[in-house]
């Protein structure tokens, strides 16, 4: 059974009053909901709260879900909007996130250290980008959504997504170029 059909089956169980079905749906999508929210908010607790808000909004809106559509696209649009709303309310703060802690942790091997350093550099670069740029990069590269899927999630045309993604890549490359200096000759 493909993933969307599994989601549809769970939704049908929810609509019939099966309380465990909602738990199953949350379990299936909580990691990605958190990831999308975290990429926009860059704050663990606020991302968790935005993801929870999105699940609550989705639960209320399930009766309006068009089962011919892909559930994940519909749901991640809700997560995206919940995170953007939280971002508007967010106060600028400097916190030590898991990613910062990860960058300072002791690594077992040189290879792991290099991998963690690259990850931390990319995280630091992403922090400097706009939430829109981070969303485009996250959805396309990390979550491997197609341009059409991103267009559905964000309610923006796929041509505009292509342009936004191109510009986001350029801005990320420029931030990395500044961060890494002589280590990087040509990122883009």
Regions found by a protein language model. Name each.
Residues 15-16, 42-43, 53-70, 89-91:
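Sigma70-family region 2
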Residues 84, 133, 142, 148, ...:
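DNA-recognition helix of helix-turn-helix
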Residues 63-67, 77-97, 115:
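Arg/Lys-rich amphipathic alpha helix in sigma70-family domain 2
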Residues 100-127:
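Acidic, proline/glycine-rich intrinsically disordered inter-domain spacer in sigma factors
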Residues 2-3, 13, 121-127, 152-155, ...:
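C-terminal edge and immediately downstream basic/flexible tail or linker adjoining helix-turn-helix-like DNA-binding
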């Amino acid at each position: 059974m493909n993933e969307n059909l599994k989601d549809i089956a769970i939704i049908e169980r929810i609509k019939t009053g099966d309380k465990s079905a909602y738990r199953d749906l949350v379990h299936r999508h909580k990691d990605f909901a958190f990831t999308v929210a975290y990429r926009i908010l860059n704050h663990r607790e606020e991302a968790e709260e935005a993801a929870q808000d999105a699940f609550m909004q989705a639960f209320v809106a399930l009766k309006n879900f068009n089962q011919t559509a892909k559930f994940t696209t519909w749901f991640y649009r809700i997560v995206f909007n919940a995170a953007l709303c939280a971002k508007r309310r967010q106060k600028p703060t400097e916190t030590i996130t898991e990613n910062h802690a990860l960058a300072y942790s002791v690594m077992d091997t040189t290879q792991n250290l290099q991998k963690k350093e690259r990850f931390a550099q990319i995280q630091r670069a992403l922090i400097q980008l706009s939430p829109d740029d981070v969303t485009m990069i996250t959805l396309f590269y990390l979550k491997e959504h197609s341009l059409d899927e991103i267009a559905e999630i964000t309610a923006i045309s796929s041509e505009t997504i292509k342009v936004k993604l191109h510009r986001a890549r350029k801005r990320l490359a420029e931030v990395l170029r500044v961060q890494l200096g002589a280590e990087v000759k040509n990122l883009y």
